[in-house]
């Protein structure tokens, strides 16, 4: 896949059009990333195939599954997996050097509760993630597509929210988003408030303080020093 595709639907559920969400960015792997891919992929990598995953088979236990879309270089995902051995983590990233870097970090940290995929997240969701099975879905700092004419390319749209809803555990599953673009934060809230079957978990306004489980990234620390804001948003599946 060269790009992530989302679909726009008519009211009766027919596909109206398919929209690019973000373009896959291929790059050269460093020798270290390439070595990590070769060494760690057999135990931590999951190849795309159009059949549902069995979490017990994937992780060897029935611990709650946290899925992250677009983990970048994987530093915070590995840290989360290390800090929460009682949970299982699956990261999906289309940028292969990022996957290599994540595997190298995971190997160094000695985590065993992390699996990764290098594929289009929407396609993985459609064909591999069982309904009603995710404890948490994480979407941290997705491409904001800040130009207004590109807003339709943002991954958080109504059809994406519905796909997420189907995969989260009913009554407890949480969709956790974070962005450093205020306009995208507003867009996320607007979309999620329209999406059926979700409730905002914020107790004051639309946003929550950064939860302890989401590590502070270097990028975010720099943003704080420059006075930039970060917005965390959590919605729970209710129906």
Curated annotation (Swiss-Prot):
The active site is at 143. One of its GO terms (molecular function) is tRNA (guanine(46)-N7)-methyltransferase activity. Pfam families: Methyltransf_4. Substrate binds at residues 147, 180, 217-220. InterPro entries: SAM-dependent_MTases_sf, tRNA_(Gua-N-7)_MeTrfase_Trmb, tRNA_methyltr_TrmB_bact. Catalyzes the formation of N(7)-methylguanine at position 46 (m7G46) in tRNA. Keywords: Methyltransferase, S-adenosyl-L-methionine, Transferase, tRNA processing. It comes from Vibrio cholerae serotype O1 (strain ATCC 39541 / Classical Ogawa 395 / O395). Its EC number is 2.1.1.33. GO terms for cellular component: tRNA methyltransferase complex. Pathway: tRNA modification; N(7)-methylguanine-tRNA biosynthesis. This is tRNA (guanine-N(7)-)-methyltransferase. S-adenosyl-L-methionine binds at residues 68, 93, 120, 143. Belongs to the class I-like SAM-binding methyltransferase superfamily. TrmB family. Gene3D superfamilies: Vaccinia Virus protein VP39 (3.40.50.150).
